[in-house]
Amino acid sequence: MGIVVIGDVFIDIKGYSLSPYIPQGRNAGTVIQIHGGVARNVAENIANIELKPTFISAVDNNAMGDDVIEKLKRHKVETKYMKKVENGMGTWLAVFDHEGDVVASISKRPDHRPIERILEECGDEIFQNADSVVIEID
């Protein structure tokens, strides 16, 4: 099985102001949305160097959750232990000023109970062939 990675998936929503940021005003800029979460990033990067990680996590039971799983599969991350549940992934909303510094952020944390259930139900199977385990749960 190789490397087991356990942790969260986040969706990062990042807004970049094109001019000096005005906290109480309207700010023109760009907004991007990307898959994030430290553990998800680690699993994808391990796969990018062809080490075949298994990712233990949860995603929301919607199209965004499906998209996260499909992207991980395209990178050759084993996703069979990922669960689709309500509040399965977090969201990080960050606002950056025109110089690239974070000026505001809000974070919605995911529910970790689905990961606990995966480990209770499948832990022996998951860890029996693991060479290494990476755990990151914020």
Q: Where are the regions that the model predicts?
A:
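Glycine-rich phosphate/adenosyl-contacting loop at the front of the ribokinase-like
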Residues: 1-56, 63-67, 73-74
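Conserved N-terminal subdomain of the carbohydrate kinase-like
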Residues: 22-26, 48-132
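Hydrophobic beta-strand segments of well-ordered beta-sheets in folded domains
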Residues: 3, 132-133
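Catalytic beta/alpha-barrel core
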Residues: 134-138
